[in-house]
Amino acid sequence: MSTSQPTPVRGRFAPSPSGRMHLGNLCCALLAWLSVRSQNGEMLLRIEDLDPDRCTREKAELLMNDLSWLGLTWDEGPGHERTHAPYYQSARRELYESALSELRAKNDVYPCFCTRAELHAVSAPHAGDGTFRYPGLCRNLTPAEAEEKSRTRRPSLRFRAPDKSVTFEDLYCGPQNINVQSMFGDFIVRRSDGVHAYQLAVTVDDALMGVTEVVRGRDLLPSTGCQMQLFHALGRTPPHYGHIPLLVNRDGRRLSKRERDLDIGVLRTRFTPEELLGRMANLLGFLDRPEKITLTELIPVYKTWFKNTGTPKFPENCVVPDNFAIK
């Protein structure tokens, strides 16, 4: 009698090299790394550089240097090439086009000729957060109508989002129920300028790279519904997801790369890796004090915290004290 072996945990960190990492990026990377290492899994590094106007190889090299300084190593990725290369999304466009061809064959995508201005004129922001739901203006165009419109305007491509809820158990937030159609409508998978959209690229990459666990910021929680629908449309099994709280200042404003004191470049001049790790672990709630600690020491601490903490494991937002970057 044969027994099936559990699938090894395979996590990933997939930053965008648009600037120096800030504290929020570092917390995501740390939690993704700790979750994988606490399960004896593998870590993948992927560089999400689809936006040529903001992302450069130089910034990617700096990003990897910062991760290495903190000790957040990866088993596969740039510098550790294995079977899933290339690891820069800008070099994976043929894979995204292949996925689009598969979706086209099932009529799961369609051309959209709407401009941003036209959509703003007919839509209201969803839930007041600035997100617009696409009202389906081009969903039922005939081939002849689409051909006529394409003579004067290059279309984007949208995915036909099923009008049903996506449910999953978030590692940190607990049970989730997302209706993509009611929240976003049919979402873009390739922009009108030919750049593949985040939702498609990240889904294709996670599927082809064998990712089984994704830890990232809570701002991406709604996107999980879109990605899970794409996984199912492509006949793939989605990974397990965990979303961590957004970092905010005491006024409740979300931290950004403009917070210079919380930029990794500044933090590296003020702290050793062990000092910074201790402060981050204290901020996230699994160390009582912001004391120096190594990654090796943090793994069992995280494991105990995860086992003993109820769900949700974090508050929705995490307030960064004013003196975080003061030694």
Where are these regions (language model features)?
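Non-catalytic terminal extensions that flank enzyme cores
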Residues: 1-20, 38-43, 70, 147-148, ...
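N-terminal Rossmann-like or analogous alpha/beta NTP/dinucleotide-binding catalytic cores
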Residues: 2-123, 127, 218-219, 223-236, ...
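Noncatalytic linker/hinge segments flanking ATPase motor cores
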Residues: 22, 85-90, 151-153, 199-204, ...
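Sparse recognition of residues in long alpha-helices and their boundaries
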Residues: 48, 79, 243, 267-268
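Short, mixed-charge aromatic SLiMs
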Residues: 51-61, 249-251, 300-309
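Alpha-helix initiation and N-capping motif
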Residues: 60, 93, 97, 116-119, ...
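Hydrophobic transmembrane alpha-helix bundles
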Residues: 78-93, 111-126, 148-159, 274-289, ...
